[in-house]
Amino acid sequence: MIAKKITFSNGLECYYSSSKEETEYIFSEIFTERQYEGHDIVIKEGDVIFDVGANIGLFSIFVKGVEPTAKVFAFEPIKPTFEVLQKNIHLHSLEDVVLFNCGLSSENNPAKIFTFYPNMSANSTTKPEDTLAELEDIQVDQNFPKIENLFEEFFQEKEQVACEVRTLSSVINELGIDSIDLLKIDVEGEEYEVFQGIEAKDWPKIKQIVAEIHDKKGRLKQISQMLADNGFKIQLEKRELLPSTFVDIFHLYAVR
C-alpha cells in the first residue's frame, strides 16, 4: 500500500494509506472532539500509556503533544497499517514511543485471523459481524444519505490476514512494567478479550482506562462488571451519529 500525506486543520501532518475520509474522522475524534480526555481522565508528566489499537498513530501523537514526557507503548497488528504507524512516529521524531506489530487479546497466538479493510484500516477486526451489517441488508438511516456509497466504496475490498496477538500480562511481564497510567483500547470488537488477557496480579498496575466498547452479546455489561470488580469507577458515553445498522458503541472511561 502506498502511504499518502495529509495536513489537518491544525497544521498537523501525517501519513495514511486508507481513505482520506476515515483519516479525517479519526483526527476529529482525537484532536477536535478530544474523545480520549475528560471524564476524570488525566495525562501527567512521565505517565506510561498503552495505545492498544494504535492504527496509524494519531492517538500516540496526541498524547506526546499533551505531555511530551509520557512514554507510549503502541500496538497495531495489521502489517500495512503498522508500517504507516512507523512512518508517522518517525515523521514527528517522537521519542519514548515503542511500537509493537501485534494486537492484544486473551491469548498468545502468532496467527490470529483479522479481516483487513485496506480503505478503512481502522475498522479492521477479528469480528467483522460486529461492525457492519451485511451489505445487502443495510437499512439506510435518513440522516446518513451517503452511507450506501461509503459501504460500497470503502468496505467491499477486504482480505483475511494472520496477525500476532499477545496478552497484556505477557507484555507487562516482558517489559517489567510497574504501572500503566492510561490504558487506551480501540480494537473493533476485541475489547473483552483484551481485558481477559490481564492476570489478577496485574490489575492493580492499571490506573485509568479509556476504551471503545462494541456492545454485542452483553459485552458492555461484562466489561463494566469486570472493571468494577477490579476497583474502577466507570462512566459511559454512547457514540451518536452512527447508522442504525451498526452495533451500539460506547466510550468507557474508568478511573480508580
Identify the residue ranges that each predicted region occupies:
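Phosphate/nucleotide-binding beta-alpha loop and adjacent structural elements of enzyme active sites
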Residues: 1-256
